[in-house]
Amino acid sequence: MPSYDPPLRPPKQARSQRTLDRISQASLELMEEGGVESATVAAIVERAETSVGSFYARFSGKDDLIRYLQDRIWSEARNRWDAALAGQDWGALSIESVVEGVVTLLLRSFRADYHQREVLGRERRQDEEGARRVFEFHQHILATVTPLFLAHQKEITHPDPEWAIRLGYRFAVGAIREILELEEAVGVVDGAATADGLIPELARAWIAYLGAGGPDPASAGSGEVDFFDPWG
């Protein structure tokens, strides 16, 4: 894969950082309200209470801004994920609780910036940079959760535990993404599955695929662990 240069170097001065933060926040708000097209440079600087010159001192144009916002959102998501993992003593948990915890954190992670990712993603979903961001984020999550699962490898009866972890991850992420898309489109429908209600079901399915958890996989999803939540 070709090398990639970030669209912006971090500001060295606090004042410059505050201006950048205001531009970023204003841009995201406008894009969430009316799509990428509504976030014109004029509208962005007006809401950010800054100048057109300040915008172009940082970005060559809106395409450059979008690249920066995408990098920022995925980087912050990765940092919050790492903080959530670090906030739990995973070694003290059963494999059922580990799986449930990972699914819980996946839902919180994807839900936190879901709309922003979707708004920005529609603009560049098929390009190489967008694919790189998504790939690297998921690879990072898999690299961090695989050791948590393999700490219970003796309980996993699947002939290829690492493959079962990867495929189970894709299954869980796909289900979470689908239900978040549904909730975004039509809201929470009475009688329909909710994203939070999906957690124990995905945990049971993943545990069953791993061949772990003893004869009663229904013990998953008990919710006895209160996981640290950096998403608020």
What are these regions (language model features)?
Residues R22, L30-D64, Y68:
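Helix-turn-helix
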Residues E118, A131, A151-A203, G213-V225:
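Hydrophobic/aromatic-rich alpha-helical bundle segments in the mid-to-C-terminal region
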Residues M1-R18, A185-V188, G214-G232:
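N-terminal intrinsically disordered/low-complexity leader segments
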Residues Y68, D82-R111, I165-G168, I199:
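Hydrophobic alpha-helical connector segments
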Residues A83-A92, A112, R117-E118, R125-E128, ...:
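Hydrophobic alpha-helical bundle segments that form small-molecule/ligand-binding pockets
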Residues S16, L20, I66, Q70, ...:
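Amphipathic, non-transmembrane alpha-helical scaffold segments
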Residues R15-S27, I44, L69-W81:
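Generic hydrophobic, amphipathic alpha-helix propensity
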Residues I23-M31, A77, L106, A172, ...:
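Short hydrophobic clusters on alpha-helical segments that form packing/core surfaces
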